[in-house]
């Protein structure tokens, strides 16, 4: 009997994968609540780390928020896909090493001075990029081969000035077919309340 995975690709996942095929170094992913952008990006990164040599930094404005969100989701997906044991997890450093593929992933908060400077990475993923400064973005992304950033469309910020037709996608909850009926109803109710 085969296992039914809880974490499966959504329309968001496929749209992001197609976007990443473009000839760009920077990819900007906007999406509201329930769009599935973070889970989709983490699934793509986990697949990369499990099949390819590479070094990845996943970061956000605050390390405590990152631990409660993206790090926790990363672990849940790896466990669900039965690949968690492929990684050596250093929980005090928030790092994952796949010794078979010689791949490495670290989770860092950008709330410590100079923490993002000097890292050479294959991929840098900035979760909730609208909560970091342009200088923090420049520091963490300067030596990266590929940069992915996501954000909720709350207000205009520095990333909007970096958007091109080849590096941007806008997702919404309709791109996440695994969203619960209750969450869909909640999101659609926001419209009637004029949020």
Mark where each language-model region is.
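Phosphate/NTP-binding elements of NTP-utilizing enzymes
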Residues: 1-195
């Amino acid at each position: 009997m085969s296992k039914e995975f809880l974490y499966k690709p959504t329309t968001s996942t496929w749209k992001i994968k197609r976007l990443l095929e473009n000839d760009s170094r920077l990819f900007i992913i906007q999406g509201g609540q329930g769009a599935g952008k973070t889970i989709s990006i983490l699934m793509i990164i986990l697949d990369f780390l499990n099949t390819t040599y590479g070094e990845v930094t996943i970061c956000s404005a605050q390390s405590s928020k990152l631990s409660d969100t993206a790090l926790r989701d990363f672990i849940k997906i790896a466990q669900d896909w039965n690949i968690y044991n492929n990684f050596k997890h250093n929980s005090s450093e928030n790092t994952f090493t796949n010794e078979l593929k010689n791949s490495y992933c670290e989770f860092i908060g950008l709330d410590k001075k100079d923490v993002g400077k000097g890292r050479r990475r294959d991929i840098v993923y900035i979760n909730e990029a609208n909560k970091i400064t342009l200088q923090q973005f420049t520091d963490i992304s300067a030596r990266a081969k590929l940069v992915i950033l996501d954000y909720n469309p709350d207000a205009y910020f520095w990333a909007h000035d970096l958007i091109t037709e080849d590096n941007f996608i806008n997702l919404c909850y309709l791109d996440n077919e695994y969203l619960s009926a209750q969450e869909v109803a909640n999101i659609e109710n926001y419209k009637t309340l004029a949020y």
